[in-house]
Amino acid sequence: MLTITSYFGFLLAVLIITSSLFIGLSKIQLI
């Protein structure tokens, strides 16, 4: 149970970091 929870937490963190990086690159390209 703990392994599944930590796995989903890690997956969510990676998704947030990837999306934030993508948004940052998009803003840089717009400028």
Curated annotation (Swiss-Prot):
Keyword Transcription regulation: no
Membrane disposition: Single-pass membrane protein
Main location: plastid
Cited Pfam families: PetL
Keywords: Chloroplast, Electron transport, Membrane, Photosynthesis, Plastid, Thylakoid, Transmembrane, Transmembrane helix, Transport
InterPro entries cross-referenced by the UniProt entry: Cyt_b6/f_cplx_su6 (IPR007802)
One BP term from GO: photosynthesis
Molecular function via GO: electron transporter, transferring electrons within cytochrome b6/f complex of photosystem II activity
Cellular component aspect of the GO annotation: chloroplast thylakoid membrane; cytochrome b6f complex
Localization of this protein: Plastid, Chloroplast thylakoid membrane
Highest taxon listed in the record's lineage: Eukaryota
Coiled coil: none
Membrane-crossing segments per the record: 4-24
Subunit text: The 4 large subunits of the cytochrome b6-f complex are cytochrome b6, subunit IV (17 kDa polypeptide, PetD), cytochrome f and the Rieske protein, while the 4 small subunits are PetG, PetL, PetM and PetN. The complex functions as a dimer.
Function recorded in the entry: Component of the cytochrome b6-f complex, which mediates electron transfer between photosystem II (PSII) and photosystem I (PSI), cyclic electron flow around PSI, and state transitions. PetL is important for photoautotrophic growth as well as for electron transfer efficiency and stability of the cytochrome b6-f complex.
Family affiliation: Belongs to the PetL family.
HAMAP family referenced in this protein's UniProt entry, alphabetically: Cytb6_f_PetL
Name of the protein in question: Cytochrome b6-f complex subunit 6
Protein encoded by which gene: petL
